[in-house]
């Protein structure tokens, strides 16, 4: 049987740190939680640059782990 996939949630945050290989540390606006995130494939393909201090939209995986930056605001 096929189970329903859990919905992914998205939050807005600010980039606080940049690491090699398009990894970033993002602090969410609602909570004071910091998470490790990576760039989505389309953002890598179009070479969209993310700088420290940028507001970004992050998609959070319901199973934990890293978040994915899907939009620069």
Language model feature labels by segment:
Residues 1-73:
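Exposed beta-strand/loop interface patches that mediate assembly or binding
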């Amino acid at each position: 049987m096929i189970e329903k996939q859990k919905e992914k949630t998205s939050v807005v945050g600010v980039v606080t740190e940049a690491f090699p290989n398009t990894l970033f540390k993002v602090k969410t606006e609602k909570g004071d939680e910091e998470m490790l995130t990576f760039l989505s494939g389309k953002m890598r393909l179009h070479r969209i640059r993310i700088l420290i201090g940028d507001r970004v939209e992050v998609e959070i995986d319901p199973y934990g782990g890293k978040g994915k930056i899907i939009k620069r605001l």
